[in-house]
């Protein structure tokens, strides 16, 4: 009996060796000529190798664990008929494809690659053009979207989709992607425990990054440039935004970063350069803003209502038209140990900290918020005079909003 059991264990152990995965080749001159046929012939853990060429196919469904691999970037043309690749199995890899002409719909979110209720997937090395949605993850988890190039041709918001979208998904890595000319570059909704790193999202119609109801996420080393409305972060908690660049997001409703109803977050080491508003903050609490650079923005920071217990420290505010804008006389936030290029105080004891507190909120910023047309008076002698009078005896701006320890030198 023991010998029989031993033989059975050995057979089970050796079974994967005898049942090795195979490769199904797809090309015009191959036995298998279409991608759908290749997937149908494949078994679990096989590789479907798509040779270089053009394949006019859409509604390609991957319903088993396999690798869909392109050789020399074969073109899959959906001919504007609908979605192109749909993954409904765990343990799927899609790699090395050039996908074009996703269909447009007002009732369905057609995507170049859609992953539905799947886990342990890898979507990488894709080039996507002429698309509605690019990569759409729906109720999926434990996957990676890596090194893809997504180039849309969006003109209007109503008939365009997002580059990478996550909906009710968890534990996803989005890394090293380039997204441009879509509606929102990266969009997350109900997506928790995700990591978004080293992506470039630029020249999109609306937001470079837009997420809501998504908690415990990390955003690191991304660049968001020249997007219609910048970046919007809403109704989320426990997020980390580290070492990102937000630049050249200009417009009357455009921000480097919009925070709305965000709690318990860390915003550290980011660059906000040449935006209409560097950070616009609404209803957001207990956030640490440290070691950020605010350079040549219209407003570096706009603090609107219901923002409490936030800490701004060791940031550089350099050459912004307005450093801080506040719409209330009450202040529960701390602005200490920052560098301000507009600070004109002195440091007699040479300890690197100014001996006179700095008031970052100017009366003129208050006036411009109420009456935008007054911006034409900027840098006039009259404005200098009223700013000075408000500095001496605050009436309209919070009298306790001070940097008590302004730094004399920029933080590296």
PLM features per residue range, with description:
Residues 3-13:
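Sec-dependent signal peptide recognition
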Residues 55-67, 76-120, 132-140, 166:
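Extracellular beta-strand-rich solenoid/capping regions of secreted or surface-exposed proteins
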Residues 23-57:
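Acidic Gly/Asp/Thr-rich repetitive segments characteristic of extracellular carbohydrate-active
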Residues 78-85, 106-115, 130-137, 157-168, ...:
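Extracellular beta-strand/beta-solenoid scaffold signature
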């Amino acid at each position: 009996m023991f010998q029989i059991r031993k033989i059975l264990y050995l057979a089970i152990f050796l079974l994967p060796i005898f049942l090795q995965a195979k490769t199904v080749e797809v090309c015009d001159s191959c036995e298998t000529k279409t991608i759908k046929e290749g997937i149908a012939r494949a078994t679990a853990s096989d590789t479907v190798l798509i040779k270089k060429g053009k394949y006019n196919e859409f509604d390609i469904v991957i319903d088993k664990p396999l690798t869909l691999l392109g050789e020399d970037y074969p073109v899959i043309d959906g001919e504007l008929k609908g979605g192109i690749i749909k993954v409904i199995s765990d343990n799927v890899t899609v790699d090395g494809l050039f996908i074009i002409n996703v269909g447009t719909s007002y009732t369905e979110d057609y995507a170049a690659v859609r992953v539905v209720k799947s886990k342990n997937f890898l979507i990488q090395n894709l080039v996507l053009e002429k698309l509605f949605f690019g990569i759409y993850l729906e109720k999926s988890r434990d996957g990676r979207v890596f090194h893809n190039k997504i180039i849309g041709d969006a003109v209007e918001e109503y008939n365009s989709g997002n580059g990478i979208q996550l909906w009710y998904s968890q534990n996803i890595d989005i890394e090293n992607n380039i997204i441009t000319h879509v509606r929102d570059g990266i969009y997350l909704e109900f997506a928790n425990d995700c990591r978004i790193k080293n992506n470039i999202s630029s020249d999109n119609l609306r937001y470079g990054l837009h997420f809501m109801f998504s908690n415990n996420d990390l955003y690191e080393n991304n660049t968001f440039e020249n997007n219609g409305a910048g970046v919007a972060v809403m109704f989320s908690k426990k997020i980390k935004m580290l070492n990102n660049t937000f630049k050249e997001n200009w417009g009357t409703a455009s921000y480097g970063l919009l925070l709305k109803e965000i709690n318990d977050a860390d915003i550290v080491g980011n660059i906000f350069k040449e935006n209409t508003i560097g950070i616009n903050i609404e209803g957001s609490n207990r956030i640490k803003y440290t070691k950020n650079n605010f350079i040549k923005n219209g407003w570096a920071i706009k603090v609107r209502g219901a923002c409490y217990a936030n800490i701004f420290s060791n940031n550089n505010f350099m050459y912004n038209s307005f450093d801080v804008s506040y719409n209330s006389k009450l202040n529960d936030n701390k602005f200490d140990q920052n560098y301000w290029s507009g600070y004109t105080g002195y440091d007699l004891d040479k300890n690197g900290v100014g001996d006179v507190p700095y008031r970052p909120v100017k009366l003129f910023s208050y006036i411009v918020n109420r009456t935008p047309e007054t911006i034409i008076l900027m840098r006039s002698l009259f404005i200098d005079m009223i700013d000075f009078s408000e500095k001496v005896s605050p009436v309209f701006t919070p009298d306790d909003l001070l940097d008590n320890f302004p730094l004399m030198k920029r933080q590296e």
